[in-house]
Structures are given as C-alpha cells and as structure tokens.
C-alpha cells in the first residue's frame, strides 16, 4: 500500500565533555543549546536581527537535511545522478524552502563534481514552486548582509544564478532595464527568494484559478512573459469525501453502504 513518510530532523549531540570536566559548565552545553534553538520553535519573530538570523538558519538546516537525505536515498538505488529528475521532485511550498535551489546546486557542484551547466539542468528539472500569495510584501526577501554572512557558499551560488538569469532577461528583452530590476534575484541589497524559485523551477503554480490568473497578469507578469510554459494552476484543498474515497476505499464503503436493519 502507498504511504507517505514524515521525517523529524534532529541535531547531533553536541555536549562538550572536555569543557564539563574542566568545570566550564556553561561552555559544555553552549553548542548544544545553540543547536537546539534550530528545532525547538519554528518561525521566530523576524522583526529583529536575531529572529531573522534564526529563521534563515532554520530554513537552511531543514532544507539541507532534506536534500541530503533525498539524494542519499536516490544514490542507494541509482548510479546516474543525471537521472535524478526522473525519480525526485523538490516541491518548494511557498518561499521558505527556496534555498533548496542553491543547496542542490552546491551538492551537485562541490560533492558530485558536476559542471555548472550539468548541475543547473538537473536542478531546473527537479524543483517546482507553489505560490500562495499575491502580496508582494509577503514574498520572502533576505538582506544580503545576513544571507552572505550566514551562508557564504550558498550566496556565491545565488549570485552566479542571478548573473546568468540577468543575461537571460537582457537577451529576451534587450534594453529593458526596468524589467531587469523587477526580476533580478539579487537586487537593491536583497536576495529575493520567489524570484530564485521561479528562475529555477520547472513549474510555477497558484492555488486557485483566480489566484493563478492574477499571478500571470499582474503580480508575476514579467516572469510569465519570460516563462509562460511554467505557469499553471493547482487548486488547493480536497473534499473530505474524495479524500476518504481515495485514501481508504474500504472505510468509505462503511459510510456509504445502506445501514443494516434488524
């Protein structure tokens, strides 16, 4: 029977016994406490710098763990990393896991030894993006200073993706500097995660017909002009009757069958 796994990512034990034996009890648990902060409470208030940094650390921790786990499972059964898109899709549900794009590129480049073009071809066939909002202010952005300081290698990769993406925009819309400014992934001191997801994803979907039309014609119109083939609608939600029929047909029969009479 088909089923879904839900994984719980945890930190390694980072208790420093040497520091404890020397009487430095605070230092002994310092790293453990810092690491535990990543998984204790998700989505901290990001109105201050500490909250922003913790949120980005959390996002990268869960993304990296998930991507590494997926690739390890793939390589356990398959030898050719180039065929990854035939077996794996990373669904970027809103912008929070969008750093997946750069993390996958990092692994393919630095650990698998692929060229940029090879890694990018695999990544763009493996990642798909779901947008949940038409409000521009809700599309996640990170200050370059924080992003580059906490994730230096990831930022290097994002910069190169941005450089190549800008060249693609300029080739398609020559002389339109306004479009470059609106679509760039790294611009005006910010790393724009939705732009990264659209540039790298093979699919960009809204969650209702009207929502998707607004994305195509208004909010993400520049991207729709460049990538019309990527945009599609996937209506969010499912009725409880359909869910039960598909999820547990035998149980559904109990609910729809005629009641027995004495």
Give the location of each predicted region.
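Gly/Pro-rich turn-and-neighbor structural signature
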Residues: 4-8, 12, 18, 44-202, ...
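Compact, glycine/acidic-enriched structural inserts
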Residues: 20-27, 32
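Catalytic alpha/beta active-site cores
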Residues: 24, 36-40, 105
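Short, well-ordered coil loops that connect the C-terminus of an alpha-helix to the N-terminus
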Residues: 114, 228-229, 262
């Amino acid at each position: 029977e088909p089923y879904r796994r839900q994984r719980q990512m945890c930190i390694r034990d980072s208790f420093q016994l040497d520091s404890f034996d020397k009487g430095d009890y605070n230092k002994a648990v310092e790293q453990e406490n810092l690491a535990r902060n990543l998984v204790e409470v998700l989505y901290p208030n990001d109105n201050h710098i500490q909250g922003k940094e913790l949120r980005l650390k959390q996002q990268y921790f869960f993304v990296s763990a998930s991507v590494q786990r997926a690739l390890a499972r793939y390589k356990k059964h398959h030898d050719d990393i180039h065929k990854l898109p035939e077996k794996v899709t990373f669904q970027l549900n809103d912008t929070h896991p969008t750093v997946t794009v750069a993390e996958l590129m990092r692994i393919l480049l630095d650990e698998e030894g692929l060229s940029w073009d090879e890694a990018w071809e695999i990544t763009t066939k493996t990642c798909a993006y779901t947008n949940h909002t038409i409000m521009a202010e809700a599309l996640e952005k990170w200050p370059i200073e924080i992003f580059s300081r906490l994730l230096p290698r990831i930022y290097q990769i994002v910069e190169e993706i941005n450089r190549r993406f800008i060249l693609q925009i300029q080739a398609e819309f020559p002389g339109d500097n306004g479009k470059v400014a609106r679509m760039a992934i790294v611009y005006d001191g910010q790393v724009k995660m939705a732009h990264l997801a659209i540039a790298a994803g093979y699919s960009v979907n809204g969650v209702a017909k009207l929502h998707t039309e607004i994305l195509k014609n208004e909010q993400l119109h520049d991207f729709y002009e460049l990538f019309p083939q990527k945009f599609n609608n996937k209506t969010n939600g499912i009725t409880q009757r359909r869910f039960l029929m598909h999820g547990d047909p035998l149980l559904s029969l109990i609910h729809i069958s005629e009641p027995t009479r004495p």
